[in-house]
Amino acid sequence: DIPGKSIGVAVSDFPLGPFVDARGSALITNDMTVERTKIYWDDIDPTVFIDDDGQAYLYWGNTQCYYAKLKSNMIELDGPIVHVDLPRFTEAPWIHKRGDWYYLSYASEFPEKICYAMSRSITGPWEYKGILNEIAGNSNTNHQAIIEFKGDWYFVYHNGGINPTGGSYRRSVCIDRLYYNEDGTMKRIQMTTEGVQ
């Protein structure tokens, strides 16, 4: 009965499901984040990162970025909700780690670009590093994931390329290579129509 967007948790014994509600209630509700914004849709786009010590963190948000530790059961918060101050944050936070660096990428402004920040700690402070990916074709939104596979890094995102005559909220999944500079910063993504081989 709480108005606004919420974040729930579903579980399954298999990656393809079936999934069931793990709690019987939302993990995050809009009334838990009203001190930062009065909008009702700020509690969206969750991502979970499990650090090297096994501690899990939930990051999420729209117009405001938040994180909280998760208990080992992964269905309860373990401490307060913390606000993360990022320039021009819109939504879709994603956390990954490479070496000693943590990377927090996110959708910025509208139409959305992907920006990122770096830190030596999963809890910050975060240093803004700029744009990672420009506006994707025929898509006002642009969300991302960054993964390592067999020693190479990949940038997964979406555009509206499959149906360019449709609306700007249609999403086509894309994947391109991601490269790092010697100082650990990420090189801007070169969006391709071919993807990866």
Report each predicted region and the residues it spans.
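Carbohydrate-active catalytic/glycan-binding domains of CAZyme proteins
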Residues: D1-Q197
